[in-house]
Amino acid sequence: MESQVRQNFHQDCEAGLNRTVNLKFHSSYVYLSMASYFNRDDVALSNFAKFFRERSEEEKEHAEKLIEYQNQRGGRVFLQSVEKPERDDWANGLEALQTALKLQKSVNQALLDLHAVAADKSDPHMTDFLESPYLSESVETIKKLGDHITSLKKLWSSHPGMAEYLFNKHTLG
């Protein structure tokens, strides 16, 4: 059944939103996996766990807001299976942060692609919706992850045995 509120909302935008919702839920799932790992009793890096749990919640909230937007525009939400994270264990915090950065860049690219579709389909409402807060927050998260990776690498070079502990306590704490 066609929506009575749908106006200037192209099917390509609708499909792109559904794909982005799935990617956001997958990202949330990956971050939750990281948080769970760092909260384990044999890892015990609670601020890493908190940092990744916050990323997980943020991605989940974004997915839910995208769903709400889809409904506001008269689109139809088609939830898909959420892919399991590729791994459950992480060698160290640096590896997890590097994986998170790669993931966040892929999320940002998906948002940029969706923005391009909306612009191509002359949907200024959707381009505006994506620009703030999603694209700006995504860039901020990429910067934060990059800064954390740089700081942890510097610590690692001067305090290899204590780097994760010090970073967990003083940077993330």
UniProtKB/Swiss-Prot annotation:
Binding residue positions for Fe cation 2: E59
PROSITE patterns documented for this protein: FERRITIN_1 (PS00540), FERRITIN_2 (PS00204), FERRITIN_LIKE (PS50905)
Domain Ferritin-like diiron: start-end pairs: 7-156
Database matches in InterPro entries: Ferritin (IPR001519), Ferritin-like (IPR012347), Ferritin-like_diiron (IPR009040), Ferritin-like_SF (IPR009078), Ferritin_CS (IPR014034), Ferritin_DPS_dom (IPR008331)
One Gene Ontology CC term in the entry: cytoplasm
Entry-linked Pfam families: Ferritin
A GO BP annotation: intracellular iron ion homeostasis
Record: residues binding Fe cation 1: E59, H62
Keyword vocabulary terms for this entry: Iron, Iron storage, Metal-binding
A GO molecular-function descriptor: ferrous iron binding
Gene3D superfamilies per UniProt: 1.20.1260.10
Entries under PANTHER family matching the protein: FERRITIN
Misc remark: There are three types of ferritin subunits in amphibia: L, M and H chains. M and H chains are fast mineralizing; the L chain is very slow mineralizing.
Record-stated family: Belongs to the ferritin family.
Complex and partners: Oligomer of 24 subunits. The functional molecule is roughly spherical and contains a central cavity into which the polymeric mineral iron core is deposited.
Function: Stores iron in a soluble, non-toxic, readily available form. Important for iron homeostasis. Iron is taken up in the ferrous form and deposited as ferric hydroxides after oxidation.
Protein's name according to its UniProt entry: Ferritin, lower subunit
Annotated organism of origin: Aquarana catesbeiana (American bullfrog)
